[in-house]
């Protein structure tokens, strides 16, 4: 009987304790909802006052779209509202052709910052560089505008001229750049062979990226007479602003036999996802160097991070941009769309790239060309590479055959080409030299 009474008392006490604990979340939820409705009433009140009392008549649709966009852009630099026209433009861009200047931009502290100019576009040809801040478009200031509003100012008819004012860290004063708008046709991948190295220049991640990559590698291997005549691959991701996650996964998978490529984690555990490599390596086990710089962002960082973590590639260059978030495009009423950050992505080792970027295994800066350098400077450098054979009256090597002399001439031509490449693109030259070195110490097949 005593045991029963004790049990009953405990049950009663637990009931007293548990009931408030169950009630608290419900009360908190009701309080939060009440506060939300209160804030929505405030929004409605302000909206009505603007319509009634603003100095000029306002467009209700534009006002609401601006409010929606303000709500989204307050979250992070990559979330935004896309009007029906903007949503249509974005779908065109992922297919590989659109009109404009050819730059990828973001917003930093209220200013428009260039992530990178896209290869062979008006912006790239006009001299726009990664890290440039655009302060004015045709004399109109951009400070205070949303990113979409600033981008809208830069749009215009193909063939029309635009003047952007740029602030660059290496320049003491802002300066203007004139650009002629054009149709931007993105070539996702360019392929070539330099010496015994296949160079794959990946400039964006759109629907054409992986098919172009696969076709280019196959073509270059066949042209070389087989993979045995190739010492390695350079995957050039410099100034690549990113693009489709699905294409970044396919490009990474192209060089990995197994293991995780990338994972994403959202707010809730069930929002996460993971992608793994499948058997097959387009490079057939040959060494790979990945080139990155501050203009390499998003999908580029997924590829660089995956190949680096699996020790499948040596990453060379400078630290990447550091965009480690995933945006989901969600259709909304009225044919518009919402670009919302829904997850962060992580490399196979669990690294988050967000705001940190991918650090290269070997840091190699791209030297800035000195505009004040003269032809005499170049001649002096070339003179430093002279050999005994270049001296007047030097003795001939009497043991050389015609084949030896032909080989010497070929080596001289290759050396001249290498010197030219070092002057034009030091980072790429370094990557190719690195693969030559790796090839030299590998055991004979």
Where are these regions (language model features)?
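Extended, small/polar residue-biased N-terminal targeting/export presequences
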Residues: 54-115, 159-163, 167-178, 184-188, ...
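Cleft-lining beta-strand/loop regions that shape enzyme active-site pockets
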Residues: 26-39, 48-60, 113-116, 121-130, ...
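Short acidic, Pro/Gly- and aromatic-enriched capping/linker segments at domain boundaries
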Residues: 334-343
């Amino acid at each position: 009987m005593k045991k029963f009474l004790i049990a009953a008392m405990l049950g009663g006490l637990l009931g007293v304790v548990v009931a408030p604990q169950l009630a608290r979340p419900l009360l908190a939820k009701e309080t939060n909802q009440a506060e939300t409705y209160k804030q929505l009433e405030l929004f409605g009140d302000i909206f009505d006052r603007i319509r009634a009392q603003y100095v000029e008549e306002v467009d209700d649709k534009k006002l609401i779209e601006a409010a929606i966009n303000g709500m989204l852009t307050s979250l992070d630099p990559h979330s935004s509202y896309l009007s029906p026209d903007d949503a249509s433009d974005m779908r065109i861009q992922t297919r590989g052709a659109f009109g404009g200047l050819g730059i990828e931009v973001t917003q930093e502290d209220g200013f428009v910052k260039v992530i990178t100019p896209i290869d062979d576009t008006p912006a790239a040809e006009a001299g726009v560089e990664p890290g440039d801040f655009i302060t004015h478009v045709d004399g109109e200031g951009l400070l205070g505008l949303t990113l979409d509003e600033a981008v809208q100012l830069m749009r215009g008819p193909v063939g029309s001229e635009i003047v952007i004012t740029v602030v660059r860290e290496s320049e003491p004063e802002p300066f203007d750049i004139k650009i002629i708008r054009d149709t931007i046709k993105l070539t996702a991948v360019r392929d070539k062979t330099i010496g015994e190295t296949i160079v794959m220049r990946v400039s964006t991640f759109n629907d054409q990226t992986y098919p172009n990559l696969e076709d280019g590698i196959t073509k270059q291997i066949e042209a070389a007479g087989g993979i045995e005549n190739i010492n390695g691959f350079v995957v050039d991701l410099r100034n690549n602003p990113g693009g489709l996650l699905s294409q970044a996964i396919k490009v990474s998978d192209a060089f990995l036999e197994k293991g995780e490529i990338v994972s994403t984690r959202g707010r809730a555990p069930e929002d996460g996802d993971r992608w793994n490599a499948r058997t097959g390596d387009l490079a057939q086990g040959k060494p790979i160097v990945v080139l990155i710089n501050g203009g390499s962002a998003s999908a580029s960082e997924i590829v660089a991070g995956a190949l680096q973590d699996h020790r499948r590639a040596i990453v060379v260059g400078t630290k990447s941009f550091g965009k480690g978030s995933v945006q989901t495009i969600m259709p909304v009423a009225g044919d518009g769309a919402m670009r919302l950050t829904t997850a962060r992505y992580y490399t196979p080792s669990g690294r988050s790239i967000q705001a940190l970027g991918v650090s290269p295994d070997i840091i190699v800066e791209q030297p800035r060309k000195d505009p004040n350098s003269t032809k005499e400077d170049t001649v002096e450098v070339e003179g430093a590479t002279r050999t005994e054979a270049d001296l007047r009256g030097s003795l001939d090597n009497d043991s050389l055959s015609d084949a030896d002399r032909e080989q010497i001439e070929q080596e001289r031509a290759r050396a001249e080409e290498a010197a030219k490449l070092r002057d034009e693109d030091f980072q790429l030259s370094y990557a190719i030299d690195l693969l030559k070195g790796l090839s030299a110490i590998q055991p004979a097949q």
